[in-house]
Amino acid sequence: MIQISALPAFTDNYIWLLQDPHTQRCAVVDPGDAAPVLDWLEQNPGWALSDILVTHHHHDHVGGVEQLKGATNAKVYGPANEKIPARDVALNDNDRITVLGWDFDIYTVPGHTLGHITFYHSGVLLCGDTLFAAGCGRLFEGTPEQMYTSLERLAALPADTRVYCTHEYTQSNLKFAQAVEPDNADIAERVESVRQLRARGEITLPSNLALERLTNPFLRTSETSVKQKADERNGRDNRSGAEVFASLRAWKDKF
């Protein structure tokens, strides 16, 4: 069974570490900095880094790739439509790869960037900066319609899917979620749970899709209360889920 843990990087990034205890091979996701990974390998002799998975081209996700590739000769997987350093395998929508014995389906999810991809294995979603705990990534390259479609695709995965995003943004995202839905009891409960985790210095990830559907405003655009709030914010009737999403995202950008 593959074990997944987080290697903290920078101020709020997580590099996900996937370990196969039977072979002592491991993989990392979005290593924006090589140092945390090299430190872990040094502290865990006998383990070999065999694979590097990259979701998109931003520096805080690829900054350590070349150094790690040089040190370990790991195979680098990344989106075909973005410039990824040292990439060995270019991935397109609906490709399938096998890493550490696990099959991963590749979904292209434009929005945060145009070529952004996610890696999905039954029960596990490695989603970079597309879906966050209680939030979603900023639209640096894509349109609101693209991001809405990408998030709807991810939200349709099984409810028990664990969500491994790459930033510790949960508390600030929940503040926005409460502004959108002040009467949502699930959000209030999650705020308290996350507050306790952070007070103990613990991470708030992974999340899961069932929880996201209850507490993430960007996955709740069809809820009447969310639509009403979005309509209030931009003073018009947002007729589609994509329009509600666009209103929420513009609000969150200034929140």
UniProtKB/Swiss-Prot annotation:
GO terms, molecular function: hydroxyacylglutathione hydrolase activity; metal ion binding
Pfam families: HAGH_C, Lactamase_B
Record text on cofactor binding: Binds 2 Zn(2+) ions per subunit.
One Gene Ontology biological process: methylglyoxal catabolic process to D-lactate via S-lactoyl-glutathione
Listed EC numbers: 3.1.2.6
Binding residue positions for Zn(2+) 2: D60, H61, D129, H167
Reactions catalysed according to its record: an S-(2-hydroxyacyl)glutathione + H2O = a 2-hydroxy carboxylate + glutathione + H(+)
NCBIfam families noted in UniProt: GSH_gloB
Complex and partners: Monomer.
Protein name as it appears in the record: Hydroxyacylglutathione hydrolase
Protein's organism: Pseudomonas fluorescens (strain SBW25)
Organism classification: Bacteria, Pseudomonadati, Pseudomonadota, Gammaproteobacteria, Pseudomonadales
Gene: gloB
